[in-house]
Structures are given as structure tokens and as C-alpha cells.
């Protein structure tokens, strides 16, 4: 497998309320295709209104509108970014915050093209200026009594929104990252990060941004001095006051890993142990139990609050009865509470935030471990190895051309990473995370709309753990994985996970993750002559379902699994019928799959299965393998010539050229086999 980049989770969707409800309703009904009287035109026009409250509500309406994909072209045509940008420096703090919120949503929902357009329209100039102003404001800001009562710092909230915009555009635009480097944004965001003891939300946003901008950015690494590293170290080692601090530590661990090239060699072992120690800590937490506990706590809190409201309502009711006859007493006026950007978000109760923070931290931890194991990415299509067993080399001799040399370089871990992985018990904790999500927690979340997104998060953690397991099994010595018995137990565990889900074939992410893990595990077991616990029938069930997947990765994995299994069975007696079944399956895939990547892997699997062994030779003759491959050979050459240059990368074409050459040699080998058996 190649490197698995950390992916951000989707932003909370804005839901304008109270005085902004009319603007929000107008935005919700818009399609983005309307003429000048549509919601986009009206909202953008109100951005220039002399009233700060009107400008604020217009920004809130735009924050809602940009979530509707059809509206994005209309907003771009009307130059929404150039109109929103100046409002980041508006005289009203509330307008600044809602404008930043609208740009945050726009950058999150619009993707690469929109973010590039935002940078082209110079959003970075007011954004960087706002970040600098907020930094000064945080140091000198005096909150009003009401703000203190609400435990809410408006300048900090603006900074948080601005950092999220910065993160989004830097994740999607190389030009934004370049500006980040040149404008000294690193120093600004590190000053924000220093405030983690009192401003955890802001610190987490900064940590996300730092993890993004430090990836593959050697220019920025030059700006990291001892002071900057100490800021990261203090965040990494901070005491845990909540699950959000766990998330912060995990993100900072990922950032420090991105800085590995500037860490002195004498300190690397210590730093790697600190990183993996933090990741081990988060993976050691039971997410299922945490979700259950947090939901119970929320239920109890809401119950207590409802009881308190009932008592207060009854008391107020008694007072109103006494005042009924007092005609001069006006009706009680409903106070209009000031609308903050947090009001524009869906309700995020503290228990839900805690649960989501832990789940996100665990997902991030697993992704960082995968990156640590796969710092070099030789191929995007999981088929850097041209052969999955030594037997195929018996007849192919030195069959690999020079261009495949870098593809065949074995993955390896430094001694420091290898030791830290085992010392921090990472393999054991990753194994635990491969289990299916806690059924009680899933049931609880499924019954509550605001908690339901946690189910997808729990499933994502399982998939990340399976991908992480694949890396660990491929790279660690089997002794550090628990030896042969542990690998056999793991194979049974993966089999149970797979076949306990009758509809597993419908979930491509899960199927790709578990087939990748199985592929690596079976390869390791085969190379060490460890008996496999999954039956050929079980594997054929997986392969028959997986080969119909729309994911090329899944299809590559299942044919590779059959190649590994078949090459093992070819050494045993009484396997003729199974080998024939495997051969027919692989032959059909090789000749009918629309992807040359899958075709190449299927041919390679055939080379492995039928490279050697009496049963394999008999099976190849009985399924007429030689005739089928001779017929397919010119078709394969033509497909490479016709489709290759336009659809596949140079590395993939290099591998396909090797498969083409190996096919010629394999046909020659099969001719000698058939002649010997039929003469």
C-alpha cells in the first residue's frame, strides 16, 4: 500500500437562526441558477449595507447557501469571494466572524477549484491581516460582562474561524501554502497554539492546519527553530483535561512526524517514542464505552435541565396569575439574544463533542501510524510487487527490467520506529481496533439524529485499523506480531469480521481495507510456511464478491489473494480441483476486467499459481491455460499500446511491460509442461 494521507472530516453545517432566519430561508430555497432576484444576488448586495446587523445576517445566509453545490457557480460568477474578503476586516466583530464562517463553508464545500479561485482572488491578504489582528486582540482584549458570563471570547471565535479558512485553502491550494510560508503565518499560528491550556478549540484548529502545511513542505521546515519545536512539544505532552486535548495531542504528533527531517539524529529515537506513546495512549481508549457513557451523560443532563425548566415555568406561571389584573403591566417581552457564530452551528452538546473528538483522534492516530510505516509511496495501485511468490521466479530467471527496480525496493522501518512500535504496544492496539464497532453504541447512535454521524466515524476507524494492520504485518518481524499462533488467530479474526457481515460486498471502503489486510497477512504466512486458517471456499466467496467491486484496489487485492493461496495449494496433494477453480477464475478476470491494472495482477497471480508443482501442472493442462493465454497475448499487447499512454502512469506502464514480458516467458514454460504431460 501507498501512503494514506490524513483526511479532514466534514465541517459542521451552518444553520442560521433567530434574526437571521429570513435570510437563511431565502438561501435554502435558492438553487444558484436564478437571475438577479435570486438569493445570491440579494445576499451579496446586502454585504454592502450600512447596518452591521444586516451585513451579519447576509453573511450567515451565504454560509448556508454555499453548502448547496448548484449555488457555487452563481456565487463565483458574482464574485462572492471579493465581496466577502473585505468583511474579514469589518468594523463589527460580529460581521468579521460571520464573514469568516461563510468563507470557511465555501472553502470546505467548494473543494480544490473553489479554494484555488479564492487564493487567485486574493483572499489570503485580508485573511492574514485578520489573523495578525486577532493575535494582538487576544493579548489585549477585555471581554464584556455578558461575554464573560457566556464564557465566550469573540476575538478568539473569529481567530478560530479564520484558522479554519486558512487550513481549508492550504489543504487544497499549493499557492496558499506558498503564501503561508512567505507571510510568516507559522509564527502567528504557533502563538495561537501556545494558548491551548485556555483555548482548546482554537488550538485544535491550529493543529489541523499545521499538520496540513507541514506535509511535503521543505521550505516551511526551515522556519522551525527550537522555540517552535518546544511549542509543539508542550502541546504533545500536555495533561488531558478532555477528549479535545487527546485530539490536540494526536494532531500535534502527526505534525511532529512531518518534521522528522529536521530533527537531529540523536533526538530521533526520543521523539519517535514520544509520538507513538501519544498515539498508543489514544488507541488504548475504548470508543464504544465512551460513546455509551457520553450519551448517558447527555440524557441525564437534558433530563435535569428539563426538570429545572418545569420548576421555573411553574414559578413564573404563579407570578403571572397574580399580575393578570394589572392592566398597566405590559406583556413580557422576549429578549433577543445576540447571535454568535456558534449559534449558526447545529447544537453541539459537550458530550457529543467529547465523543466525536475521541473518535477523530483515533482515526488520526491510525493514519499517522500508516504514514510512519509507508513514508515512501512507490505506487498508487497496490501492485508494486510483480510477483507474490518465489516459485514464479524459477522459470522467469531475471525477468525484471531496470525500470522496475525502484518498484521492487522492499519496504523497511528504521530501528527507532520498529522499536517504538513494539515498545508502545502499537500492534496489539491496532488489532483491537479492527473489530467491528460496539453494537450497543451503534444502536444508541442510530436512534438519535445528532449522534448518528458517529456510526460512520466508528466504521472509518475500523477501516483505518485494517489498513494500519496491513502495514504492520508487511513490515514487522512475525515475532513482534506474536509469532505464528498470533497470525493464525488474526486470520480467523479477520475471517469472522468479514463473514459476519452478509452485505460486506456493498461497502467498498471496508472491503478494500479488509482485503488489503488479508492480502498482507496471507503473504506473510505463506512466506513463513505458516498454515493458513481460512479455507479455499471462504477465500473464493470473498473473491467472487470482491471482483464485482467498482474499486480497482479491491479487485487487485482479491486476485492477489488467490495467487497467494493457489501458490501454497500447488505444493500440497489433493488440491487439483481447487487449483482448477482458482485458475479459471483468474483467467476470466485477466481476459475480461476493464482495468489493465487488474489484468496485470491477475496474470501475475496465474504465474504464481501455475509456476511449479505436479497438481498445478495437471490443472493448467485440464483448464487449457496455455491456449487461453496464447489467444489473449496479442489482445493484451494491443490494450497496452492503445490504452496505456493515456490512462496509466509511467510506473504502471513499466509494470505492465514487465507483465507482458513475463507472459511471453510463462507461455514458453507452459508449452514445455503441456508437451511433457501430453506426449
From Swiss-Prot:
Ranges occupied by HEAT repeats: 38-69, 74-110
Modified residue annotations for Phosphoserine: 15, 144
Residues bearing the modification Phosphothreonine: 339
Alphabetical list of InterPro entries matching this protein: ARM-like (IPR011989), ARM-type_fold (IPR016024), Nuclear_Import_Ribosome_Adapt (IPR052616)
An annotated GO BP: protein import into nucleus
Domain of life: Eukaryota
Gene3D superfamilies listed in its UniProt record: Leucine-rich Repeat Variant
Keywords: Erythrocyte maturation, Phosphoprotein, Repeat, Ribosome biogenesis
Segments for region (Disordered): 1-40
SUPFAM superfamilies according to UniProt: ARM repeat
Biased composition, class Basic residues, residue ranges: 1-11
PANTHER family: HEAT REPEAT-CONTAINING PROTEIN 3 (PTHR13347:SF1)
Quaternary structure (record): Component of a hexameric 5S RNP precursor complex, composed of 5S RNA, RRS1, RPF2/BXDC1, RPL5, RPL11 and HEATR3; this complex acts as a precursor for ribosome assembly.
Entry's family note: Belongs to the nuclear import and ribosome assembly adapter family.
Role: Plays a role in ribosome biogenesis and in nuclear import of the 60S ribosomal protein L5/large ribosomal subunit protein uL18 (RPL5). Required for proper erythrocyte maturation.
Descriptive protein name: HEAT repeat-containing protein 3
Amino acid at each position: 500500500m501507498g501512503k494514506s494521507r490524513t483526511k479532514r472530516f466534514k465541517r459542521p453545517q451552518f444553520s442560521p437562526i433567530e434574526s437571521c432566519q429570513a435570510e437563511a430561508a431565502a438561501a435554502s430555497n435558492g438553487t444558484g441558477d436564478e437571475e438577479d432576484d435570486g438569493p445570491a444576488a440579494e445576499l451579496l448586495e446586502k454585504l454592502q449595507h450600512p447596518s452591521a446587523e444586516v451585513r451579519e445576517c447576509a453573511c450567515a445566509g451565504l454560509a448556508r447557501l454555499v453548502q448547496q453545490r448548484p449555488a457555487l457557480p452563481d456565487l463565483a460568477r458574482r464574485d462572492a469571494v471579493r465581496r466577502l474578503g473585505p468583511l474579514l476586516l469589518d468594523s463589527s466583530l460580529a460581521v468579521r466572524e460571520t464573514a469568516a464562517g461563510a468563507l470557511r463553508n465555501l472553502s470546505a464545500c467548494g473543494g480544490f477549484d473553489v479554494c484555488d479561485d479564492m487564493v487567485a482572488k486574493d483572499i489570503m491578504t485580508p485573511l492574514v491581516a485578520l489573523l495578525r489582528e486577532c493575535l494582538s486582540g487576544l493579548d489585549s482584549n477585555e471581554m464584556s460582562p455578558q461575554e464573560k458570563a457566556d464564557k465566550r471570547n469573540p476575538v478568539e471565535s473569529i481567530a478560530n474561524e479564520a484558522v479554519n479558512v486558512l487550513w481549508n485553502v492550504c489543504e487544497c491550494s499549493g499557492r496558499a501554502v506558498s503564501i503561508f510560508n512567505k507571510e510568516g503565518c507559522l509564527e502567528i499560528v504557533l502563538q495561537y497554539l501556545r494558548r491551548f491550556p485556555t483555548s482548546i478549540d482554537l488550538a485544535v484548529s491550529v493543529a489541523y492546519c499545521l499538520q496540513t502545511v507541514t506535509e511535503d513542505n521543505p521550505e516551511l521546515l526551515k522556519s522551525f527553530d527550537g522555540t517552535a519545536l518546544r511549542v509543539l512539544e508542550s502541546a504533545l505532552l500536555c495533561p488531558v483535561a478532555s477528549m479535545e486535548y487527546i485530539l490536540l495531542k494526536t494532531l500535534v504528533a502527526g505534525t511532529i512526524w512531518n518534521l522528522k527531517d529536521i530533527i537531529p539524529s540523536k533526538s530521533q529515537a526520543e521523539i519517535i517514542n514520544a509520538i507513538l506513546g501519544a498515539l498508543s495512549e489514544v488507541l488504548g481508549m475504548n470508543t464504544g464505552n465512551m460513546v455509551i457513557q457520553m450519551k448517558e451523560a447527555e440524557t441525564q443532563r437534558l433530563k435535569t435541565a428539563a426538570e429545572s425548566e418545569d420548576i421555573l415555568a411553574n414559578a413564573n406561571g404563579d407570578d403571572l396569575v397574580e399580575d393578570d389584573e394589572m392592566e398597566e403591566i405590559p406583556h413580557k417581552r422576549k429578549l433577543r439574544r445576540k447571535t454568535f457564530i456558534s449559534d449558526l452551528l447545529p447544537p453541539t452538546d459537550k458530550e457529543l463533542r467529547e465523543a466525536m473528538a475521541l473518535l477523530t483522534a483515533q482515526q488520526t492516530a491510525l493514519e499517522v501510524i500508516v504514514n510512519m510505516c509507508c513514508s515512501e509511496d512507490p505506487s498508487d495501485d497496490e501492485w508494486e510487487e510483480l510477483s507474490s511468490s518465489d516459485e514464479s521466479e524459477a522459470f522467469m530467471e531475471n525477468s525484471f527490467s531496470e525500470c522496475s527496480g525502484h518498484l521492487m525496493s522492499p519496504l523497511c522501518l528504521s530501528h527507532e520506529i520498529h522499536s517504538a512500535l513494539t515498545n508502545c504496544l502499537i500492534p496489539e492496539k491496532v488489532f483491537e481496533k479492527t473489530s467491528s464497532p460496539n453494537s450497543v453504541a451503534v444502536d444508541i447512535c442510530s436512534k438519535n439524529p445528532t449522534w448518528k454521524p458517529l456510526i460512520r466515524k466508528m466504521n472509518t476507524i475500523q477501516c483505518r485499523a485494517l489498513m494500519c494492520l496491513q502495514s504492520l504485518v508487511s513490515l514487522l518481524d512475525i515475532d513482534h506480531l506474536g509469532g505464528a499462533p498470533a497470525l493464525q488467530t488474526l486470520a480467523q479474526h479477520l475471517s469472522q469480521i468479514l463473514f459476519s457481515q452478509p452485505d460486506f460486498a456493498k461497502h467498498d471502503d471496508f472491503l478494500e481495507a479488509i482485503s488489503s489486510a488479508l492480502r498482507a497477512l496471507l503473504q506473510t504466512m505463506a512466506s513463513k510456511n505458516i498454515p493458513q486458517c481460512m479455507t479455499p471456499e471462504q477465500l473464493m466467496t470473498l473473491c467472487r464478491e470482491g471482483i464485482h467491486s467498482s474499486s480497482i484496489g479491491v479487485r487487485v487485492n482479491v486476485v492477489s489473494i488467490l495467487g497467494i493461496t493457489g501458490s501454497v495449494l500447488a505444493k500440497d496433494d489433493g488440491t487439483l480441483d481447487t487449483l482448477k477453480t482458482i485458475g479459471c477464475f483468474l483467467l476470466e478476470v485477466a481476459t475480461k476486467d476493464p482495468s489493465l491494472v487488474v489484468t496485470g495482477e491477475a496474470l501475475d497471480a496465474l504465474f504464481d499459481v501455475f509456476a511449479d508443482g505436479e497438481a498445478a501442472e495437471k490443472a493448467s493442462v485440464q483448464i487449457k491455460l496455455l491456449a487461453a493465454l496464447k489467444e489473449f497475448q496479442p489482445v493484451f499487447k494491443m490494450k497496452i499500446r492503445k490504452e496505456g499512454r493515456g490512462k496509466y502512469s509511467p510506473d504502471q506502464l513499466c509494470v505492465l511491460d514487465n507483465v507482458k514480458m513475463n507472459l511471453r516467458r510463462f507461455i514458453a514454460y507452459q508449452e514445455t509442461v503441456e508437451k511433457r504431460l501430453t506426449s
